């Protein structure tokens, strides 16, 4: 697509019109060298065939830009009894080039009629001309054929009447149900359009670049309410007792942000400092669980308005807990929808982790009101500009608004999580081509979200928080109500200097940042766009290899590949053409100051000012790279940890544990060396570091347990219970202490009970018995609920009682804990019953099926059961979840990513190949095959070492 609207050849009138009227919000440049009519006339045989057998006049997946929408007028009438809806719309469009057809998106809609009026027709109230409608479902497009060619630079009004069933899944305009305390099932209608499902609710230009205003009217029964992006203006009484709600016209926005709901929910409301009304909606029986969300939403909205120096532009903000919701939440402008467990908080059954999750998701979605809604990416290849920023802003906002949640200490795990994905060759660049609806859905992954956030955090550390904040404010203000791309962000970050700032390479530092390290940066003359292109336009993560030679540090960078060893024949090919501009940081035994250097070459040398005993790179794990220390580097750091680990920052200790075990997977560090590093953990007081060490040891335990390698399983179990006995024994069974104290408690006790630690089993059994005897009325501390339920689920009586309580519970947090516990049963018939209930979607909602299959597959007794179910029911699963959607990807990865034998690899490969059009092209399949291969290599290389190390350690 062209970079500037100046490239358009318009007459003087159109140039003026675009500049004065459209440019502040939308000025779409043609992506084609000739008009659609010219292309069609030149070679009509190259075009597809519509459903009626006629030639469909458009053959691209992307819509032509000769006609652009300015305003939609929508009238929707859902029937919650017959579960369908009828609707009509008028779209005001601007014709930029003469054409005889208009191409729109439409999916599963029955078009009843379509007509067209010119500006003159509208002015003189002339009836519209009927249009011929052609449909091409393969591209989810319709063509409106006009009798006479539409004239360039004029506006027209397109009127369409249509109808459809409310969707059965979780996309478009769909139905959702909930049960009241009295056992009644009630139905609501709700929308979820991102990324490409607005076309399931109304014919539209369903691409993010086509921003427009929306005026929405909804018809409903009096027992329901209607919600939409904007406040309600008025309600009109219609014949037959129906009501018609009219909503204010929206600001200019993309179709995927349009939202409306018809429901019978109740709400609690508050007001932000700026006067914006904030409301939390939920089903009536769950109203009491909305109060924490209201507190958090008001506080976070106040924060963002201040931080971005831009007022939230709408008069109200509604947050709604939806009973059936596939993802965590959706940032519809002014009407944010959530899965119930992402918004509701029950003080009795919601744990510390639940509270952190709810707060984090609210922070994420509110950040989208600026990043994504106010400024939107041009196309889905840059979805990271929405999602990476929203994830990054979770960190920034929660550090200020909820410091007691200590979110800063958990952000490193955001980066560690995506490194597992990004270190595979099947990864993709942050900014990646996406054309089809399935490819677009697959872009919503850890790379776009987490890696996006991590490189932004690294860039913030590089530029300084002050400079970075100025840059993003500049970016948001410049592109308000418009679309942006990668380069626009780098330009904004490079051009926000104030008087007196030091400048270099287009970016700036305030006087307060003029340290020796900063001056070294300035001498590097870094070009920000060039630097960040190495992080967004190529996949993967760099490995920085450090070797200390006297008072010099020899640095080398290469691509870090998990599961590919340097001696493997493909290693060299996979390294070709990879080079990053890495803003490395380090500290030494001689100086705790943070030293900085930009590694732009394959090899480089850094001179130290004085002799040092050790050096630690990637200070506070703020950089997105792995570090390997050659020579005596690792031995020096292991000695340091054992002698006085507090000489390193807590996040540096966390980073060392992570990097060490990642390097084992790449064959760069021996497993015994990494395990030796964890010996200091008995003295560790930083809980994130302690939990990271436990995480890897538990991972190894589950791996050998699944493979039934009994001697290693027993020895590792013995080691865990022996080595971490002091930590286990000091845990209480109460909800007390800091956030990290409570997360340590739940993690350690959960592992101890999983390992059949007698005191843990005894205490959990005691609490479960008391809970059953109280008919579920006993309040068990929320942080240990999962543990107590999991132990209780091991008996038939306990399992059955938990299933009964699952049906009765009004707390989504409690239902999640019960469902997890039920999936830990050792009885396969019980596990199969659970999965069948999940497929049925009544007792266990379909939205929870993916999680259920994931947790069942983690159970050694359920791993093959879950996998067999997926193979046998793939077609049925695709009827419930869209191809490429997060639930489908979770189901595939959850049931196969733990496989570690060649037979399992072959079985999975054959299944994937058999799917063909039903999914064989999905990126997740390549990820899984590579993951299983990595697991196989890990065991082959490291099992003997693990066995030997354990024998010398217990």
UniProtKB/Swiss-Prot annotation:
Glycans are attached at residues 79, 113, 399, 644. Keywords: Adaptive immunity, Aminopeptidase, Disulfide bond, Endoplasmic reticulum, Glycoprotein, Hydrolase, Immunity, Membrane, Metal-binding, Metalloprotease, Protease, Signal-anchor, Transmembrane, Transmembrane helix, Zinc. InterPro entries: Aminopeptidase_N-like_N (IPR045357), Aminopeptidase_N-like_N_sf (IPR042097), ERAP1-like_C_dom (IPR024571), M1_APN-typ (IPR034016), Peptidase_M1 (IPR001930), Peptidase_M1_aminopeptidases (IPR050344), Peptidase_M1_dom (IPR014782), Peptidase_M4/M1_CTD_sf (IPR027268). Zn(2+) binds at residues 364, 368, 387. It comes from the Eukaryota. Residues 29-954 are lumenal. It is an enzyme of class 3 (hydrolase). It is found in: Endoplasmic reticulum membrane. The record marks 449 as: Transition state stabilizer. The chain crosses the membrane at residues 8-28. One of its GO terms (molecular function) is peptide binding. It is a single-pass type II membrane protein. Belongs to the peptidase M1 family. PANTHER family: ENDOPLASMIC RETICULUM AMINOPEPTIDASE 2, PROTEASE M1 ZINC METALLOPROTEASE. Heterodimer with ERAP1. This is Endoplasmic reticulum aminopeptidase 2. The lineage of its organism: Eukaryota, Metazoa, Chordata, Craniata, Vertebrata.
